Swiss-Prot record:
It comes from the Bacteria. One of its GO terms (molecular function) is protein kinase activity. NCBIfam families: PRK01059.1-4. Catalyzes the specific phosphorylation of arginine residues in proteins. A motif (RDXXRA motif of the pArg binding pocket involved in allosteric regulation) lies at residues 328-333. Pfam families: ATP-gua_Ptrans. The gene is mcsB. One of its GO terms (cellular component) is extracellular space. Keywords: Allosteric enzyme, ATP-binding, Kinase, Nucleotide-binding, Transferase. It comes from Clostridium kluyveri (strain ATCC 8527 / DSM 555 / NBRC 12016 / NCIMB 10680 / K1). Its EC number is 2.7.14.1. Coiled coil: none annotated. This is Protein-arginine kinase.
């Protein structure tokens, strides 16, 4: 399974940035995470580690990370890479995660549930990430007793996760639908089929840079295969709508669209100050140009990397010091200029 940041698939016009699976699990006869004190939570962590690291090669390929040992910037870097959730960070005093060396598998411990198995990769590859997450789940279940009800399925802290405990999501770049204000029209339609649309960092986040996450909202009464099949079909429909919208834009406003795209590239190559929001918006315009074949000398993987590396915590780490907002904006602009200079012809 490839790291989504270093993967750029031309299938579906490059619109699909990543596919992710999360499986919510809880240990039997133990209260949910929010009911546990620090000592009890650390026992859960130890139980999960003992169950996982008994298998061969796991200690060589995986590493435990304890959030109480990390500073805020380190935690936010993992969040910016989509490796952990905001909820896990909120539980820092009693939370941990096990991460593989390719940064594609993350087992979050003491988030909303005792265990959240997450697998993420590039492109529209829901079946692949589900297969990997299911294998991890089976390994853990060999040594852990899960909270499971014969009628309801897996028991979870949030009622919407009861059942399969499966949350599948696909991250999409939808600039044309955003520009035409068509995203809101999808909200009601998605809700009616048990799906939802969120921003770049999931629940409660904004769709900065025209990046959206489409995911299932309900797991009870539906099989894993049904959830994945429905989500994939829906994503393909949305991709088709985005492509049609782009074609219409190109027909009606060809010069204006090309001007917008090349101006964005020009600003990114020459700006002295860039805040994170402006940077993501400009990167979206350039990504649109790459996806439509208008810009031919920018690498799609470079844009994926900049999507992460231009974020506040990662910029702070790259320049190795506590930066003021203005200094961070200065260094972000410098970093983007240098990356685009190297990765353009």
């Amino acid at each position: 399974m490839n790291n989504w940041v270093t993967t750029y698939e031309n299938h579906n016009y490059g619109l699909v940035i990543s596919s992710r699976i999360r499986l919510a699990r809880n240990l039997a006869k133990i209260p949910f995470s929010h009911k546990l004190n620090i000592e009890e939570s650390k026992k859960v962590i130890k139980n999960v580690e003992n169950a996982f690291y008994t298998f061969s090669n796991t200690e060589e390929k995986f590493k435990s990370n304890y959030l109480w040992d990390k500073n805020d910037n380190e935690k936010n870097i993992y969040l910016e890479k989509h490796l952990i959730s905001k909820n896990l960070i909120d539980n820092s005093s009693k939370a941990a995660f096990i991460l593989d060396d390719k940064e594609t598998i993350s087992i979050m411990i003491n988030e909303e549930d005792h265990v959240r198995i997450q697998c993420i990769t590039g492109g529209l590859n829901l079946e692949e990430v589900y297969d990997v997450s299911e294998k991890i789940d089976d390994l853990l279940e060999e040594n852990l007793e899960y909270a499971f009800d014969e009628k309801l399925g897996y028991l979870t802290a949030c009622p919407t996760n009861v059942g399969t405990g499966l949350r599948a999501s696909v991250m999409l770049h939808l600039p044309s639908l955003s520009l035409n204000n068509q995203i809101n029209g999808f909200l009601n339609a998605l809700a009616q089929v048990g799906m939802t649309i969120r921003g770049l960092y999931g629940e409660g986040s904004k769709a900065i840079g025209n990046i959206y996450q489409i995911s299932n909202q309900v797991t009870l009464g539906r099989s894993e295969e049904e959830i994945l099949s429905n989500l994939k079909a829906l994503v393909l429909q949305i991709i088709n709508q985005e492509i049609i919208s782009r074609e219409n834009l190109m027909k009606k406003y060809k010069y204006e669209l090309e001007d917008k795209i090349y101006r964005a590239l020009g600003v990114l190559k020459s700006a002295v100050l860039l805040n994170s929001s402006e940077c993501l918006k400009l990167l979206s315009d350039v990504r649109l140009g790459v996806e439509m074949g208008i810009i031919k000398d920018v690498n799609g993987i470079t844009l994926n990397k900049l999507l992460v590396e231009s974020q506040p915590a990662t910029i702070q780490k790259i320049y190795g010091e506590s930066l003021s907002n203005k200094d961070r904006d200065f260094n972000r602009a410098k970093f983007v200029r240098e990356k685009l200079a190297v990765n353009t012809a």
